[in-house]
Structures are given as C-alpha cells and as structure tokens.
Amino acid sequence: MHGRKRLYGEALLLLTAMIWGAAFVAQSAGMDYIGPFTFNGIRMSLGALVLMPFILSKRRARPAGEKEDPKALWIGGTLCGIALFAGSTLQQIGIADTSAGKAGFITAMYVVLVPVCGLFAGRRQSWLLWASVGLASLGLYFLCATGGALAMSKGDLLVLLGALGFTAHILIIDHYSPKVDGVKMSCIQFGVSSVLALVCMALFEQPHWGAIVQAGIPLLYTGIFSCGVAYTLQILGQKSTDPTVASLILCLESVFAVVFSWLISGEKLSARELFGCGMMFIAIVMAQFSGAKAQAKQPRPKPQGNTP
C-alpha cells in the first residue's frame, strides 16, 4: 500500500469526520420536530437516492473485463446497513437527552472498541498505535467529564451503545470494501437501513407532514452530505487505511461536533474540552506515524490485474 494512496484515504476520512461533526448539530435540531425512526428513515432514503446517478453513470463507463463480486457486494452492503441502523438509531434516540457536542464525544469511543475487536480477529497492533488509542481515550474523558466526573445520563448510555454499532460498521467495511465497488455498497447499506427505520417508524411513530417539512434543512444536510457523501467517502477512504487508524481519524468527528456546536448553536468550549481536543489531535498524528511504519515494513505487492 503506497504512501500517497494511504494519505489520500486518510484525507477522505478526515473530510468524513468534518461532515459528521456538523451532522450532530443537524440531528439535534431535527429531533425537535420528528422522531428518531422518521428522521433516520428519511435521511437514509435521501442518501441512497443521491448515490443512484453515480452508480448508473459508473455502470455505463465500466471498463471492459472489469470484474465484480455481486455476492460480497450484497452481503457486505446488507451487514453494513444493519450495523448502521443499530448505531444511528441508538445515537439518534440518545441525542435527545444529551448535547450534540457530548454525543459526538461519546460516539467516538469506537476508537477504543475497534482495536479491541481486532484482537479477537487475530490482528496485532503496534505499541505506538495502542499508545495513541490510550491518549485518544483520555482525551475523550476530558471532553465528556466536563463537570469533573464521568456522569452518564440515559442519553449518554444510548449513544455509547450506538458506538458498538459503528464499531461493527467499521470492521465490516474493512472486510468487504477491498472486494466491492464502494459507491454501490454505500447505496445498498442506506437502502437496508432506511427500510428498517421506516418499518419501525410505521410501528412506533406517527409523523406529520408539517413536522417533516419543519425538519427539512436538518434532513437535507444529513441525508445528502452526512449519508450520501460522507459514508461513501468512508468506504473509499478505508480501502487504503488500517481500520484502527481509520477509527482514530473518524473519531475527530467529536472535535468537529464541538466546533460546529459552538459556531452554530453557541455552545462554548471550556479549557478542559480544548485540552481533550488537543490530546485527540496528538493521538491522530501518532496513529498516522504508526500506520506509515507498519506499511513500510510490508513487502511491496506485485502488480496485478484490475480489481473491482
């Protein structure tokens, strides 16, 4: 895996984190008008619709002889959709009982969960990467424990459980993304997630058209940018990035959530929160050095034919 390709993947993941950070503010605003299943069902549907033109154009422009693995595409997309539904639903329900900024911090706990799950899969991590995980976790503590103690409300706990869903999502992407077309896989995951959310909406919520219109701007932002654009960038970025490094970069969404909450909603950053943000940035740099060293030790792969 070449250094330029790795940096390109990390840049895509950083942009993803920025888009998601702003989405926490939009999600919090949307909950003032509609329920979590309605919100997620509509925004996931928008995400799938946004990607359809790109899929159709890529199909017409596909080079002759390019191979695809339909089975891996549908299995990976379906599993991603289920994991995304679980994570986003718990996060959306929990965000109604906590601040947008704090929800961003707690969601980023997948930075710890990804390498821990990797151990069960037999994936070894360097000491530098584990040090960056520890530093990022400590940074999350300073961000969450703004009152001097790590007090978990019901909303905080639901968002933390949602982080488990996002952990599974990252690991599933890591397994399937090298084998499939990233845009197609992203579209399938949104389709699966939206169907699950809309079924739950019909069972547990009674949305009104007027309320949906009032939540229009948050829905459009989260549907087009947070779903259609950002989740696709995540899949493309993870093609050339170690999953633990990817999780560390993506956890910067918590930092961006604080920044955008301050800029848009007027939430102020305390010195403690700024200190936590700084620790997380240092952890990201350490993780990137770790990823570069690990890839430098790997033998350069022999040239092969086109892969999907």
Regions found by a protein language model. Name each.
Residues 21, 25, 81, 85, ...:
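Hydrophobic/small/kink-forming positions within alpha-helical transmembrane segments
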Residues 2, 44, 52, 56, ...:
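C-terminal-most transmembrane helix of multi-pass membrane proteins
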Residues 7-12, 38-53, 74-75, 129-138, ...:
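Hydrophobic alpha-helical transmembrane segments of multi-pass integral membrane proteins
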Residues 30, 39, 43, 94, ...:
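Hydrophobic/aromatic residues within transmembrane alpha-helices
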Residues 51, 125-145, 166, 197, ...:
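Hydrophobic transmembrane alpha-helices of multi-pass small-molecule transport proteins
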Residues 1-41, 82, 86, 90, ...:
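Glycine-/small-residue-enriched transmembrane alpha-helix faces in small-molecule transporters
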Residues 40-42, 103-109, 173-194, 227-263:
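Helix-helix packing/entry segments at the starts of transmembrane helices
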